[in-house]
Design a protein with these regions (language model features):
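Auxiliary Fe-S-binding modules of radical SAM enzymes
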Residues: 21, 25-109
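Conserved active-site beta-strand-loop modules that form the wall/rim of enzyme catalytic pockets
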Residues: 12-14, 35-36
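Single conserved hydrophobic/aromatic residue that forms the stacking wall/gate
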Residues: 1-11
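Canonical radical SAM enzyme core domain
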Residues: 5, 15-26
Length: 109
């Protein structure tokens, strides 16, 4: 019994929004059971557009609900401030990291 209780306390639920192809509202679903949201654009030659504003709105929802947020990658076609960036695969992760928008609340939960 104590093992089962301890194991349940360690389970983390993540929501993966990748590829993020449109603006979404996860606010109604973010709770104590959801501890992380991961978002990113699509890779590959047929990749569809991901917009930075969608990423930021998802991040804001996480901020308001104290849920960890990880911007994993921009994807191949990324729109920021109205400009379309065509990014080679090797830059998807580093460009997302440079945005500096990840959130980490786990120690507070």
């Amino acid at each position: 019994e104590p093992y089962r209780r301890q194991r349940q306390m360690c389970i983390r639920e993540a929501v993966i929004c990748e590829p993020l192809l449109e603006q979404i509202d996860l606010s109604p679903y973010l709770s104590k059971d959801i501890t992380q949201v991961v978002a990113g654009g699509e890779s590959g030659i047929n990749a569809r557009i991901c917009r930075y504003e969608w990423i930021l709105k998802l991040r804001q929802q996480c901020l308001e609900n104290h849920v960890d947020f990880y911007f994993k990658q921009t994807g191949a076609k990324f729109v920021k401030d109205g400009k379309l960036y065509l990014l080679p695969r090797k830059l998807h992760h580093s460009q997302a990291k440079k945005a500096g928008i990840n959130l980490h609340f786990s120690s507070e939960q």
